[in-house]
């Protein structure tokens, strides 16, 4: 992580004067005090327990500075109104500083598989990093950004949603160059009025994208009302711009052709949905 204490303070609009602290380079940012090592920034988030209760432990483990919503005695700290908001602002700043190309993936199903396939394809030509595990929410995404290797060129971010507006926040933070919506299903329907509202939330992935950026979306009538006007939208599915033209399924593998691919692709997995995921990752 190529950041220093003073730089972090500026990025998060610190409420205190940090110029008296050494402008030490930081190794990484952690919100779990048990994972803190020498040279780290501690991010005391509030969850089941208040991370502020573990600030002392974080410094014992090697932290050189902490974000905090209150004054900290005896240790360097960066005072902010809200630690989570500051964490997100720091990640947004870091993406802008590094200039890494961001690829974002969401969907009710298939987003993790598609993320992994896309990252694999990009890694053949670029230094690529991707969301680890299920770190796809308002905490996990900034954590992913701040943990990418210093030489990263392409960053593939998975974006999840439990409530309407979740993906809007993530997109505005990450400003994707390319985004994919794999499928609009009924996952998390308990938190949404209906499938149409799920589609609305998923398509908010375009909210932070620049004019002319590429958005891949399913050829599903449910998404039509929410497609952006300023981005290049390419649909996939039967009868759409991108489609599978031939599919051979075997016991433990498959081969498929798509209308834009010059040759067939072989996959060591089964299921047409995996062929679709691979197709859109390959575009």
Describe the residue ranges of each PLM region.
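Residue-level recognition of short, solvent-exposed, well-ordered loop/turn junctions
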Residues: 37-38, 210, 279
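Short, polar loop motifs at secondary-structure junctions
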Residues: 63-73, 218-223, 238-239
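Phosphate-binding loop of NTP-binding sites
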Residues: 7-12, 87-214, 219, 223-232, ...
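A generic structural signal for residues located within well-ordered alpha-helices
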Residues: 50, 165, 201, 219, ...
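N-terminal leader/targeting and accessory segments in enzymes
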Residues: 1-89, 270
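Structural signal for conserved beta-strand scaffold positions within catalytic alpha/beta enzyme cores
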Residues: 44, 68, 79-80, 104, ...
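Thr-Gly-centered strand-to-loop micro-motif
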Residues: 31-32, 43-45, 130-132, 157-158, ...
């Amino acid at each position: 992580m190529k950041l220093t204490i003073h730089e972090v303070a500026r990025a998060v609009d610190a409420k205190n004067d940090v110029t008296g602290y050494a402008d030490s380079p930081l190794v990484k940012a952690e919100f779990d005090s048990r994972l803190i090592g020498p040279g780290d920034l501690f991010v005391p988030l509030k969850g089941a327990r208040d991370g502020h209760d573990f600030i002392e432990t974080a410094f014992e483990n090697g932290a050189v500075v902490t974000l905090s919503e209150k004054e900290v005695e005896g240790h360097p700290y960066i005072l902010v109104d809200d630690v989570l908001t500051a964490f997100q602002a720091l990640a947004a700043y870091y993406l802008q500083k590094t200039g890494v190309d961001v690829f974002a993936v969401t969907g009710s199903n298939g987003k993790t598989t598609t993320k992994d396939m896309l990252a694999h394809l990009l890694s053949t030509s670029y230094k690529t990093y991707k969301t680890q595990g299920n770190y796809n929410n308002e905490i996990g995404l900034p954590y992913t950004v701040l943990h990418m290797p210093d030489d990263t060129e392409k960053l593939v971010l998975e974006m999840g949603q439990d409530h309407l507006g979740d993906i809007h926040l993530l997109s505005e933070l990450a400003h994707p160059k390319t985004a994919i919506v794999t499928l609009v299903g009924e996952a998390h329907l308990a938190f949404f009025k209906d499938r149409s509202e799920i589609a609305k939330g998923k398509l908010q992935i375009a909210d932070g994208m620049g004019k002319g950026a590429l958005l891949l979306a399913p050829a599903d009538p449910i998404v039509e009302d929410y497609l952006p006007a300023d981005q290049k939208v390419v649909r996939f599915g039967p009868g759409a711009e991108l489609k599978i033209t031939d599919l051979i399924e075997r016991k433990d593998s498959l081969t498929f052709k798509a209308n834009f691919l010059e040759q067939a692709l072989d996959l060591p997995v089964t299921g047409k949905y995996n062929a679709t995921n691979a197709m859109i990752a390959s575009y």
